[in-house]
Amino acid sequence: MQNLLTKLEVADFEFLAEIIRSRVAFTSDKHLRAAISAFASETQSTDKRLALCALVEREIRYLGSSDAAYFLRKVSHRTGGPGVTFREVVTDVFRKLKLKQPDALCTDEELVEHLVQAFTTLRVRQLPFDQQKVLLESAGMSASDVGTYLKNNSARFALPAIIQLAGMAAAQRIVTNVVIGAVGNYIGTTAARSMVTHLATRFPVWGQSLGPIAWTLTGLWTAYDLQGPAMRKTIPISLYLGLCMLRDGGYDTDAAEPGAAGDAR
């Protein structure tokens, strides 16, 4: 997981901290905030970056564990730390969202990239025709291309086809809107808007990609998606990490199918 976290920027850590924060349990909000501030004051420091990454990993692994199990592993000094592994966290997210994991062995970065692409594919397929149309048009596709595409593909939306038809930039806009809309569903639209506004100053392409459709999507997904308390944190964290890994265009142009689970509702 460290290879994944070391690719993040200060703004990413701040976003994750907002999701992680909790008034209960073993989370260390104060320590996490202090580590982010220390890294922000000296972003070239390898030691400060690694210390922050280690703390974030610990928090995420804790969130994927039950309090009782975490405490028992903590007092028994379990090798590798008391939390479940990051891969276990993401595997549980795949299961909760009813998405199929990739069959081939892959890195943590590739795993969360696949998660985001499969999630986007499933969610867009579930949208009503008119919402799909708005989403695709907001990604920069012409009305003519959108009409042609949806006429035959509204139930079979696939990112590789979008990349072929409209280019990588359009695919990135679609994924960004869907993922940020989903994160807003879990942490609240007001909080998500505030955090995204901050992120847009660091990553202008995200600011350009996000439109009103992202917040419309937030309202379309039902309470089913909210899952339990832990999943309300591990799902948006995993999706956000996947979005970060795709920021430089690492899309799988072959496929990222949601799998045989079908409609996740």
Please describe what each predicted stretch is:
Residues M1-I163, A264:
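Terminal export/targeting leaders at protein ends
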Residues V179-D263:
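Membrane-engaging insertion elements
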Residues Q2-K7, A11, I19-S22, R173-I174, ...:
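Anaerobic metallocofactor- and corrinoid-dependent redox/one-carbon enzyme cores
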Residues V124-I213, Q227:
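Compositionally biased, low-complexity segments of secreted and virulence-associated proteins
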